[in-house]
A protein has these predicted regions:
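Short, well-ordered coil/turn segments that N-cap beta-strands
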Residues: 95-96, 117, 146-149, 205-206, ...
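Enzymes and membrane/adaptor proteins characterized by extended Gly/Ser/Thr/Asp/Glu-rich
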Residues: 112-235, 257, 262-275, 303-318, ...
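N-terminal hydrophobic targeting/anchoring segments and the immediately downstream early-domain regions
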Residues: 45-48, 53-151, 155-165
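Alpha-helix-loop-beta-strand connector modules within alpha/beta enzyme cores
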Residues: 141-147, 230-251, 316-337
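Sec-dependent N-terminal signal peptides of Gram-positive bacterial secreted proteins and lipoproteins
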Residues: 29-49
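Short, Lys/Arg-enriched N-terminal segments with co-localized hydrophobic residues
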Residues: 17-28
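Mid-to-C-terminal alpha-helical segments outside catalytic/metal-binding sites
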Residues: 385-410
Length: 410
């Protein structure tokens, strides 16, 4: 037997010997496999099941955003007076500075040529008229004016009566404030002023050059008969009461003659110098003006007196210092006007045209003028060549227009 035969026999024996084991092994392996499968399935069933976090549904519509709120913009309505001023020519603006003495023969032409701010009516303008004819005349003046006019008069009563001296308008002259007060105190004096307001209103006159604020104790003084004849306190009560009455009737009030005439001479015929101290003026003469300003007066008329406490050289009407005192110290923001610029206290020293220029430069808004043709040309030239500040001109015209507005003219 060869080596290879021997090996073959040994291999056969091993195989035969292993068969029972393999048979057992095969059965066992099947069972083991089945057991593993069952264990695996059981383990899978017992294992916890992972659950994912719930997801919110994606919104399909946009979340509404609150509408943006807008704050309403408040706009200041345009000022009709400013619009009127802006529309005016330089010539028209200069003309508004003039309260001219009415010349009946050329009145309609002059209103349009010089663009006059107003007329002052004197006795001759009422002579031969009736209330109806006068109303018609004054309506004609207003119709001719591009801008409604101030129609003013001196109806103080007593020695200064432009209207009531004529029976067509009143059976007898109005008494002076002094006479009315002496007859019935403040009540009677104010009743007299109210009747004056009613008469002026009925005729179409919108300004009375009063009340007189002056205090005069000297029976020989120029202003004595025209003053109330009382102390500063009583005069102040009369002035304030008169201003309130005039405002109620829409009659323009004009406090005169700032800063107080006192016992001084008549400036119609020459220069008057007041040498009193400022303390003396402030403790007496200026008090009625303060009362009138507080009551709401429309205008203040400045005298031609040289008041040395405020300006040692210039008449008050032409003095920047006097006007500054009236504005800054007295607190007056209305119309400031001159007494008539043809009075000799002015013309003898300055001439007609130059006086008007100086009056505007001093701070007057309104010039009482008889020679308005010459003075209008002088003021216009001074504006054009820069001697009169254009902004100052506009400020004066604005004050005049605002006064007209307060009187129901604009």
């Amino acid at each position: 037997m060869t080596f290879f035969d021997s090996c073959a026999r040994m291999s056969a024996r091993r195989t035969c010997a292993a068969l029972p084991f393999l048979a057992f092994r095969g059965t066992t392996m099947k069972r083991f496999s089945i057991l593993l499968i069952l264990l695996f399935l059981t383990g899978c069933a017992a294992a916890p099941v992972e659950t994912s976090e719930p997801t919110l549904p994606t919104p399909t519509t946009e979340v509404p955003v609150p509408a943006e709120t807008t704050v309403p913009v408040t706009t200041t309505p345009p000022d009709p007076i400013q619009e009127l001023l802006d529309s005016m020519t330089i010539e028209e603006r200069v003309g508004q500075l003039f309260l001219a003495r009415c010349n009946a023969e050329s009145a309609l032409t002059d209103i349009q040529e010089y663009h006059l701010g107003g007329f002052v009516l004197f006795g001759a303008d009422f002579e031969g008229q009736t209330p109806d004819s006068l109303r018609q005349t004054l309506s004609g003046y207003q119709a001719a004016a591009g801008i409604p006019m101030l129609l003013a008069v001196d109806e103080e009563g007593g020695t200064v009566t432009r209207i009531s001296r004529y029976p067509a308008f009143r059976s007898q002259c109005f008494p002076s404030p002094r006479e009315a007060f002496a007859g019935g105190g403040l009540t009677q004096a104010l009743s007299n002023e109210e009747e004056i307001c009613q008469l002026l209103q009925s005729l179409g006159i919108n300004v009375n050059l009063g009340p007189v604020c002056d205090i005069s104790e000297d029976p020989n003084a120029f202003m004595y008969q025209r003053s109330l004849g009382q102390d500063a306190a009583a005069t102040g009560d009369f002035v304030a009461g008169t201003v309130r009455l005039m405002n109620a009737y829409q009659i323009g009030s004009v406090l005169k003659h700032f800063p107080g005439y006192g016992n001084n001479a008549d400036t119609h015929t020459g220069l008057a110098v007041d040498s009193r101290s400022l303390q003396a003026l402030e403790s007496s003469d200026l008090l009625p003006f303060s009362a009138g300003i507080e009551a709401g007066c429309g205008a203040v008329l400045v005298s031609h007196n040289i008041v040395q406490a405020l300006d040692r050289d210039s008449p008050a009407s032409l003095s920047p210092a006097v006007h500054q005192y009236l504005r800054d110290t007295m607190g007056f923001d209305g119309v400031v006007m001159t007494d008539d610029l043809v009075m000799e206290a002015i013309t003898d020293r300055y001439g007609t045209g130059e006086a008007a220029v100086l009056a505007v430069q001093a701070g007057n808004d309104l010039l009482c003028s008889t020679d308005y043709a010459e003075q209008y040309s002088a003021v216009l030239s001074a504006v054009l060549d820069g001697r009169i500040d254009f902004d100052a001109l506009n400020a004066s015209v604005m004050r005049v227009l605002k006064w007209k507005q307060s009187l129901g003219l604009l």
